[in-house]
């Protein structure tokens, strides 16, 4: 996918999110990628998934994110997603991330595809972490993923 696609996708997500935004709920986070731990450890995956991205929280339950990271099969992945986390327990949010990503040759030859994964988030005043589970599927070896983030606004 082209850069233009990702710019349009992120702008569309932000505009849609702003329409349902709650007052005083806006937060901007920068993430630096993270780590993965694959269920099948015999395949020599890269589990240090450094990257850069942004996440904009528009309500206690909803945020939009976009970024890029070095994935488990040593390719660059670009993504854009909406995180819907309706279950809150203090600073812990639980729900799902829904979005588009690329960079995995076994899925649509490395092109863009839809992805959904369960997502648990902890957000403190300045530091946060997203925890996800990628399930085992036909062409996907599952993993636990951890993404670290820092609040900038």
Residues covered by each model-derived region:
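Cleavable N-terminal export/targeting peptides
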Residues: 1-25
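Outer-membrane beta-barrel "beta-signal"
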Residues: 30, 34-38, 141-153
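Transmembrane beta-strand segments that form the barrel wall of outer-membrane beta-barrel proteins
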Residues: 30-38, 62-71, 93-106, 120, ...
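Solvent-exposed loop/turn segments connecting transmembrane beta-strands
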Residues: 39-47, 68-78, 88, 102-113, ...
